[in-house]
């Protein structure tokens, strides 16, 4: 912002954990206007480990078998929230692997808002590592909850189901189509 790096966290949150800032006894109004360079002593910044993310989209990493990976960005429809559960299986029994995904995270602090725009996604594979998103009405997979995990299970007759583990709620069960 304005050519400077500003803290993302609120003053109370940082001063409760970083003694250097607590000792400065900065007013909240002053804290809001100061850059990272103005808040922290030079020696603290010089000893800071800086990490940088270069990909912010949801992706899959495809291993070529020799430890080399190709990154494929998933379709725009799955980019609206986090993905916490994913299963790779042949949903439509065409011989190609498909992806079933769900997610959301309601545990963020209020200033960041919650990630709640993932309603579950089915991506049909084309056999060439391309995936096409399916409408909810076509896939039958629609789940607005905070899904923490997806698992494929079978009943005694061999019918396949996807069970979604939902935070603070009962699991949901989805039967896969037979073809």
Where are the predicted features?
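Beta-propeller-forming repeat regions
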Residues: 1-179
């Amino acid at each position: 912002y304005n050519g400077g790096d500003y803290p993302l966290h609120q003053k109370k949150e940082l001063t409760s954990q970083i003694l250097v800032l607590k000792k400065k006894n900065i007013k909240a109004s002053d804290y809001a206007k100061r850059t990272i360079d103005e808040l922290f002593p030079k020696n603290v910044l010089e000893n800071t480990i800086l990490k940088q993310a270069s990909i912010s989209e949801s992706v899959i990493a495809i291993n070529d078998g020799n430890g080399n990976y190709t990154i494929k960005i998933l379709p725009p429809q799955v980019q609206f929230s986090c993905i916490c559960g994913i299963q790779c299986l042949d949903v439509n029994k065409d011989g190609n692997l498909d992806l079933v995904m769900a997610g959301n995270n309601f545990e963020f602090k209020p200033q960041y808002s919650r990630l709640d725009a993932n309603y579950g996604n089915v991506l049909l594979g084309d056999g060439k590592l391309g995936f096409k998103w399916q409408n909810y009405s076509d896939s039958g997979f629609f789940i607005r909850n905070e899904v923490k995990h997806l698992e494929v299970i079978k009943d005694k007759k061999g019918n396949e189901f996807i069970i979604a583990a939902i935070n603070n709620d009962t699991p949901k069960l989805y039967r896969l189509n037979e073809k």
